[in-house]
UniProtKB/Swiss-Prot annotation:
UniProt-recorded name of the protein: ATP synthase subunit 9, mitochondrial
Organism: Neurospora crassa (strain ATCC 24698 / 74-OR23-1A / CBS 708.71 / DSM 1257 / FGSC 987)
GO molecular function, one term: ATP hydrolysis activity
Site feature location: Reversibly protonated during proton transport: E57
Record flagged with keyword Mitochondrion: yes
Pfam families linked to this entry: ATP-synt_C (PF00137)
Subunit note: F-type ATPases have 2 components, CF(1) - the catalytic core - and CF(0) - the membrane proton channel. CF(1) has five subunits: alpha(3), beta(3), gamma(1), delta(1), epsilon(1). CF(0) has three main subunits: a, b and c.
Keyword tags: CF(0), Hydrogen ion transport, Ion transport, Lipid-binding, Membrane, Mitochondrion, Mitochondrion inner membrane, Transmembrane, Transmembrane helix, Transport
Similarity remark: Belongs to the ATPase C chain family.
Gene Ontology process terms (BP): proton motive force-driven ATP synthesis
Name of the gene encoding the protein in the UniProt record: atp-9
């Protein structure tokens, strides 16, 4: 019974990866729109996009880390 609860909890913890995927899509979609509107700001917008990607990916990695902790440690 405990093993089943671990697996269910791990599956629920990985749903945080959905938000990270959506966030990364929004960041790079906005980068494409911004560059198409003003190509002269490409380097500055790209730097902001990489920063947004890093923050979004970090939340996804935290969710994945929690899932692994629930599965293997708890």
């Amino acid at each position: 019974m405990i093993q089943v609860a671990k697996i269910i909890g791990t599956g629920l913890a990985t749903t945080g990866l959905i938000g990270a995927g959506i966030g990364i899509g929004v960041v790079f979609g906005s980068l494409i729109i911004g560059v198409s509107r003003n190509p002269s700001l490409k380097s500055q917008l790209f730097a902001y996009a990489i920063l947004g990607f890093a923050f979004s990916e970090a939340t996804g990695l935290f969710a994945l880390m929690m899932a692994f902790l629930l599965l293997y440690v708890a």
